[in-house]
Amino acid sequence: MIDLLWISSDGHPQLFYQFINIPFAFLFHCLSSQGHLSIINRYVYLAMGGFMLAIATMGPYSSLLFLSAIKLLLLIHYIHPMHLHRWILGLQMCWQTCWHLYVQYQIYWLQEAPDSRLLLAISALMLMTQRISSLSLDFQEGTISNQSILIPFLTYSLYFPALLGGPLCSFNAFVQSVERQHTSMTSYLGNLTSKISQVIVLVWIKQLFSELLKSATFNIDSVCLDVLWIWIFSLTLRLNYYAHWKMSECVNNAAGLGVYFHKHSGQTSWDELSDGSVLVTEASSRPSVFARKWNQTTVDWLRKIVFNRTSRSPLFMTFGFSALWHGLHPGQILGFLIWAVTVQADYKLHRFSHPKLNSLWRKRLYVCVNWAFTQLTVACVVVCVELQSLASVKLLWSSCIAVFPLLSALILIIL
């Protein structure tokens, strides 16, 4: 299993590192639930775990995270809560963008491959930006009252289960999970087994698709096969994300995070920290629905940070900020522009066509056609965003699949 996870990482070792984190998260939960760790020691355990994980996986580049954590504590101590969010988000995005631009300088100007440890550190820095900007907004909204003890804030910025993979957890939910730590061991172990099994299945399916892409099936020059190849390639990239998100969810659950107790039914839910279901997301029959389901905690963060706080063109401002957060590579800029246009066109098309769907067969036909359109458009977005460089743009526009983003733009203009 470990070999399978390592092979499937394909230069993105977060999946493997997150798997290695599970025993340490399990130990934390066992010690906490049995009363061997005080609340302060729980925070220390999680923070020290993040500190050591960063050094072990990122080497000297772990300082990117440590400097951000120190800056967070200084700002919390010296800045009034009402002004904290503006300072934290502004400084953190400047710090993160500088490193993104440095990577682009290495790739496009020096023609050098960046250090993999630097790329991992920047990825972790992006996740830290989510956490500390969410924290600062909570301060501004008055949902956090006690800021005299700084250890919970330091731990929240660096705790090891979410350091390399999320999902985003609000500060108040994080504190409640750390301080509670009482769950049924049967439910706990059953949940971990189930989610690890899901990761294995996702990795296995991804490997099958990877082998299919290398097969002789696609050596024939055909428009349909060309479009099919790009769609399968995009699906393979998405499966990598789904496996990584599920593994990160599993690590958080192993540490006792993301659990919710239903008082009325007496049952325990382990899905409070989740970036969504692969089946629900891939079954989305509208681009706008897919956009809301994809990487759900990040979508909620973008809605909270940008969409709900912007009066002019909130949709395009949100996708623009997402491109900035991801690194502003040429492919990413094009990919998020395509996605924004497609989602806006979907809203217009739905308002136009919905009154005309007055029979069952029309509704089913509309759903089927729109699902295929969603899949092919998302394929264009994912290829651009993931390949990042101008090569992704060339790959996209040399294929007939480029018709679908253009069709979205046409719908947006006409309707």
Curated annotation (Swiss-Prot):
Main location: endoplasmic reticulum
Coiled coil: none
Catalytic residues of the enzyme: 295, 326
Cross-referenced InterPro entries: LPLAT_7/PORCN-like, MBOAT_fam
Record topological domains on the Lumenal side: 1-6, 59-61, 104-122, 215-227, 327-328, 386-394
Keyword Transferase in annotation: yes
Catalytic activity line of the entry: octanoyl-CoA + L-seryl-[protein] = O-octanoyl-L-seryl-[protein] + CoA; decanoyl-CoA + L-seryl-[protein] = O-decanoyl-L-seryl-[protein] + CoA; L-seryl-[protein] + acetyl-CoA = O-acetyl-L-seryl-[protein] + CoA; L-seryl-[protein] + butanoyl-CoA = O-butanoyl-L-seryl-[protein] + CoA
Compartment list: Endoplasmic reticulum membrane
Ranges of the Cytoplasmic topological domain: 29-42, 79-84, 139-193, 248-312, 346-364
Membrane topology: Multi-pass membrane protein
Entry GO terms, CC: endoplasmic reticulum; endoplasmic reticulum membrane
BP GO terms, sorted: lipid modification; peptidyl-serine octanoylation; response to food
Source domain of life: Eukaryota
Family designation: Belongs to the membrane-bound acyltransferase family.
Subunit structure: Monomer.
Name this polypeptide is given: Membrane-bound ghrelin O-acyltransferase mboat4
Organism: Danio rerio
Gene: mboat4
